[in-house]
Each structure stands twice: as C-alpha cells, then as structure tokens.
Amino acid sequence: MANILITGASSGVGAELARRLATRGDSLFLSGRSEDKLKNLGLNASIFAGDLTSPGAAEKLVASAISELGSLDVVIHCAGIGLIKPAADTTDAEFTHVMNVNTRAAFLLARESCKVMAAAKKGLFITIPGILGKAPMRNASAYVASKYALTGMIKCFAQEYQRSGLRFCLFHLGGIDTPFWDQIQMAVQRDKMIPVATAADLILQAIDAPPHLVLSEVVMQPESHQLV
C-alpha cells in the first residue's frame, strides 16, 4: 500500500484513479476545487478543497497531506483547464489564467511535494500534459504553451532530483473522454477518445513499476491520431 496525493480528483481521470486506488487499499489524500464533488466520491480518503493557484495553497496542501498520511509515496497531478481559441482572439487574461492553472500550479505542487519526497529518498511524481504537451494544434496556442511548459518543467525537476530516489512520469495522452470536453467549444468524437478506465490502467502501471524503473514518458493516442 502507498500514500498517494491526487489533484483534480473530483472528476475524470483523477476520480477514476481515486476509486481504483481506494479499492486496493492505498491511503489517499484528494484535492479538487469542489468539496462537494470530492465528498460525493464516497471514498475513505482525506480531502482538500481549494485553488492551487491561490497564495500558499500548494504548501498547505502538501503539509496537510503529510499530516494526514504521515508521508508521501506518489503524487498524481491531474488538475488543469482547457482553452481552445484562436491566438488572435485570446485575451491577456485568458492566457495568464491558463498558464497559472496548468503550469504555475503544477510547479508549486512539484516544488513542495518533491522537497518532502526527496528527504525520504523515494517518491513518484506523475502528471498528464496530454498530447498537446508535445505536439502543436491550431486554435490552442495558449493551452499548448501551458502544456509544453509543463513538460519541460517536469523534465528539469527530473534532472535536478536525479539520483535522489525520486521518479517522474509524463503522460502524453490523446483526448480522454471526460467532462473536460463539456466546457470546450469544439466538435469532437467522444466515442473515438481514450476511455477514462484505459487512461487509469496506464497510470496504474507507472505506480506499480519496480522502484528502480520508471515510465518516463508515455504516449497513447486514438488510432486515427497515431504518431503525432
């Protein structure tokens, strides 16, 4: 059993992972913006409702997780937002917001949690830049920028914590059939997307890998978009 912190745990991949990990007996600390949604998961887990972009939120989240769990073995960062919009129509405020949520919040969480895990000389940090963390897409420049930055940032963390016992895993997954798409003004074929259960299966493989091995970067795409 492991002590695991999951952000973005109230829906989508984060919620699916929380349910799977709780079933097998791992100790969980779940974070999301909606306390009600976290409680409605009905899991035996500690919860933290808040906005990771708020001052001091990441520090408080990690400290609370340590207080409840005693230690951290795995951090799974699933929180994020989307923005599909032509560059010419993207406002300064929209660009700043998507970078704050998708990149800055991830940096703050990684900074605080990696300090703790490095002190214990073990730990796994998983995040999901998605396929747009390594491939461009029209009408998504701000979103792609936030995900490319996330990819590069975590690779820097991996270098800085080399030989410290920490492992880092990036999941470059294509479109996953989650509520994320409910808020996106874009025609998509939900039935062609990666099922949430399949994405969770893949991430569980990274968690269960032997401690001397790491799935550094994992790419999974729908067949129609392979080799992007």
Over which residues does each language-model region extend?
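Substrate-binding pocket helix/loop in short-chain dehydrogenase/reductase
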Residues: P86-A87, E94-T96
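Residue(s) in the substrate-gating loop at a strand-loop-helix junction
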Residues: G130
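Conserved glycine-rich cofactor-binding loop
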Residues: S10-S11
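The beta1-alpha1 cofactor-binding region of Rossmann-like NAD(H)/NADP(H)-dependent oxidoreductases
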Residues: G50-L61, D92
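Conserved glycine-rich Rossmann-like NAD(P)H-binding loop of the short-chain dehydrogenase/reductase
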Residues: R24-L38
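C-terminal helical subdomain
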Residues: R163-L166, L170-F171, V188-V228
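Active-site helix of classical SDR
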Residues: A110, S146
